[in-house]
Amino acid sequence: MAVQLDARPPVRPAHRTTRPSRGARLSRFDATYSPYLYVAPFFLVFGVFGIYPLVYTFWVSLHDWDLLGAEHPFVGLDNYSQLLADPDFWHSVVNTLGIFVISTVPQLLAALWLANLLNRQLRARTTWRMAVLIPNVTSTAAVAIVFAVLFGRDFGMINWLLDHVGISAIDWKANRFAAWVAISTMVDWRWTGYNALIFLAAMQAIPRDLYESAAIDGAGRARQFWSITVPLLKPTIIFAVIISTIGGLQLFTEPRMFNSGTNAIRGGPLRESQTVTMYMFENAFAPHYNFGYGSAIAWLLFALIALVAAVNVLLLRRLGGARKGDPR
């Protein structure tokens, strides 16, 4: 039998690469770029109403920008150097920080306690949870008018109560620290319930198994609160602190409405409760109309808010300790 030694295996024909169809290319393009198109409107709106005003305000702060004048000469950093040497500006900074500390610390502590109370098995829980939000949806002007009457010097209810315990009447608008306390009380009344609902929403996400295990081990409610609830609420507490910092350092309506009269924007005759935003309004608009100087105040306020918020976050992380998995 003859054997063919030079036989070779059959060669397969070369595989022809086919171009993806038009539909496949469109599908790949959609999967790759459509998420960016979906979020593009947000960044567009943020750029128009967020980034552009911020940049434009900085540009204006470099000019002697009189709102009633036609020319706006470039002055560089003169507005900032003048502002840093302005005693009225630093007076308003101290007022802002004082009101912020007096209002924010009790506010967040009360909100945390209130949220823990609302997280229990109460009758008509939905009604109570809705009720704590009523002060926040009330008109700020109406709240300010009511509190201005409560803290009135001659016929206010607070002085009437103080008189019954042997304390002489306090002029809440003429005394600097007293004005801080009055305005802080107004701010706390409006925003404690709002922060309580934020904490409550975070508490609802904590697994109930942790509390049941702690109860089996003999931990009481107080121990469960400090050992389970507070550590797991750390990201939410940081969020609430940042939001409260932004709002507290931009305080305007409450002190403005509390100090009604001819010196309202000045926070009283001796600027007892004038905040940075009120001082910015006084310079940028009536009576000075110096928009460049007011823009410089706005930028320094922005820097102050960023600094205080960063310090708050660092302190909370340092006091609470860094746990694995915490957002940074």
Task: List PLM regions with ranges.
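Acidic/proline-rich low-complexity IDRs
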Residues: 4-7, 11, 25, 166, ...
